């Protein structure tokens, strides 16, 4: 369940060696100086501001969430005066209803420039389709926050140009000091011992500034994967025990500062195999409800995000053997067991679930806690509000499929033993860097298929 800033310096500048670009070649995007015309039978399709591609007989498309009957109320943005005086979008009900989600340009560029060149021709159209699926942008280092502004500006421009339905921004806030306290693969940039709490608050302030600047852009945030769940089950780990007060202070600060009219937030809540056990449900609900009330019951905190970067099913008729007797063996059972406890404690929460890598069920995990680059997985259900459960706001893609969970190199400083298990695909690169074999696995096993 790991994600870390990639060290790969992506470049979208490819050599112009012919007047017309071949099928699947790049034909446009910011900074592109090569061919802009495609060979006969292909059309130059703009996938994002940074990348256009020659696709056979295709035109650019946007992915729209199919919506439920829950209504979304917005104030229409004006077409003048961008930036600090932008009109404010306000939301009520399901924050996904009535919006299409933003396709992550960075992930799209990874797919097109890293994955597709080495894929067999039969998989290239499928990979191109994956690049168009909206996935969350991870703000896993402070240096990425300005890029958030770039994306919000792009969304603002598209919405003013008449995007219908309007586009919502989707981001993961993920930079706690002493991050990933119970594992090693995704340790972050801040240390509690080295001014980490103050640095984190500055990071949150920078995110808030972007959200205020683009107050006419509806934005959905997932807050700190793997943080509060560790405070439920892993306080026996010294690093987690030492981080407890800092985690709570930092998450409280984030919830208060990002409680804005144009924002909807979901706190990370692990998954069924972590907090869904009967012994963990009560303590988890108590913690989440206390965090909610301590932050002043922020209106923007819609609920909890589950299965982030994990592989669990939404609903199973039979519990797999690796769930080891947990009655809440899928995410639907988990949230329906958790929700009443939260409500009784004053937090009327709704949920979202990451389905980016849960297309194959049952999984090939040897144990339910095996989280690193699990073999045999596939892309799952595309983003949708058609969940069939009033507690579940949406299925979404939070983890960018194809980015590694962690390295299998045991000599690495960030090596975690889970990444060397027999059910982890190997050899694997560092967390957050591109893992071509894993992307191909997800693509080949996608359910529904591309």
Swiss-Prot record:
GO terms for molecular function: cellulose 1,4-beta-cellobiosidase activity; cellulose binding. Residues 91-450 are annotated as: Catalytic. The keyword Disulfide bond applies. It is found in: Secreted. This is Probable 1,4-beta-D-glucan cellobiohydrolase C. Keywords: Carbohydrate metabolism, Cellulose degradation, Disulfide bond, Glycoprotein, Glycosidase, Hydrolase, Polysaccharide degradation, Secreted, Signal. Residues 20-55 form the CBM1 domain. Has a modular structure: a carbohydrate-binding module (CBM) at the N-terminus, a linker rich in threonines, and a C-terminal exocellobiohydrolase catalytic module. The genes for catalytic modules and CBMs seem to have evolved separately and have been linked by gene fusion. Its main location: secreted. PANTHER family: 1,4-BETA-D-GLUCAN CELLOBIOHYDROLASE C-RELATED, PTHR34876. Pfam families: CBM_1, Glyco_hydro_6. It comes from the Eukaryota. It catalyses: Hydrolysis of (1->4)-beta-D-glucosidic linkages in cellulose and cellotetraose, releasing cellobiose from the non-reducing ends of the chains. The active site is at 180, 226 (proton donor), 405 (nucleophile). It is an enzyme of class 3 (hydrolase). The lineage of its organism: Eukaryota, Fungi, Dikarya, Ascomycota, Pezizomycotina. The gene is cbhC. GO terms for cellular component: extracellular region. InterPro entries: Beta_cellobiohydrolase, Beta_cellobiohydrolase_sf, CBD_sf, Cellulose-bd_dom_fun, Glyco_hydro_6_CS.
């Amino acid at each position: 369940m790991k994600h870390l800033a990639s060290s790969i310096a992506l470049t979208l500048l490819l050599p112009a060696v012919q007047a017309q670009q071949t099928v699947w070649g790049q034909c446009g995007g910011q900074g592109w100086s090569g061919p802009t015309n495609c060979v006969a039978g292909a059309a130059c399709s703009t996938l994002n501001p940074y990348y256009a591609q020659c696709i056979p007989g295709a035109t650019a498309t946007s992915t729209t969430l199919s919506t439920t009957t829950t209504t979304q109320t917005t104030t229409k943005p004006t077409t003048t005066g961008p930036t600090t005086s932008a009109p404010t979008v306000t939301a009520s009900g399901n924050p996904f209803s009535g919006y299409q989600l933003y396709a992550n340009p960075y992930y799209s560029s990874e797919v097109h420039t890293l994955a597709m060149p080495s894929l067999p021709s039969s998989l290239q159209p499928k990979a191109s389709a994956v690049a168009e699926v909206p996935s969350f942008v991870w703000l896993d280092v402070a240096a990425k926050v300005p890029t958030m502004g770039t994306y919000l500006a792009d969304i603002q421009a598209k919405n003013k140009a008449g995007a219908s339905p309007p586009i919502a921004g989707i981001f993961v806030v993920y930079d706690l000091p002493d991050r990933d306290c119970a594992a090693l693969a995704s340790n972050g940039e801040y240390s509690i011992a080295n001014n980490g709490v103050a640095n984190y608050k500055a990071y949150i302030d920078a995110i808030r500034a972007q959200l205020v600047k683009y107050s006419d852009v509806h934005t959905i945030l997932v807050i700190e994967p793997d943080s509060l769940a560790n405070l439920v089950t892993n306080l026996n780990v010294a690093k987690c025990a030492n981080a407890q007060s800092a985690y709570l202070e930092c998450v409280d600060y984030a919830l208060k500062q990002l409680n804005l009219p144009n924002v909807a937030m979901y706190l990370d809540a692990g998954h069924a195999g972590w907090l869904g056990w009967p012994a963990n449900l009560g303590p988890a609900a108590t913690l989440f409800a206390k965090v909610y009330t301590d932050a002043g019951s922020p209106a923007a905190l819609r609920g909890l995000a589950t299965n982030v970067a994990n592989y669990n099913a939404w609903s199973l008729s039979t519990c797999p053997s690796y769930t080891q007797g947990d009655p809440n063996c899928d995410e639907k059972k988990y949230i329906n067991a958790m929700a009443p406890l939260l409500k009784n404690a004053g937090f009327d929460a709704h949920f979202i679930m990451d389905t980016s890598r849960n297309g194959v069920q049952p999984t090939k995990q040897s144990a339910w806690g095996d989280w690193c680059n699990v073999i045999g997985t596939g892309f799952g259900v595309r983003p949708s509000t058609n969940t069939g459960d009033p507690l579940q706001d949406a299925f979404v893609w939070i983890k960018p499929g194809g980015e590694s969970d962690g390295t299998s190199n045991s000599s690495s400083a960030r090596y975690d033993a889970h990444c060397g298990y027999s059910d982890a695909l190997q050899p694997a690169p560092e967390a957050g860097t591109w893992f071509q074999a894993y992307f191909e696995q997800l693509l080949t096993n996608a359910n529904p298929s591309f």
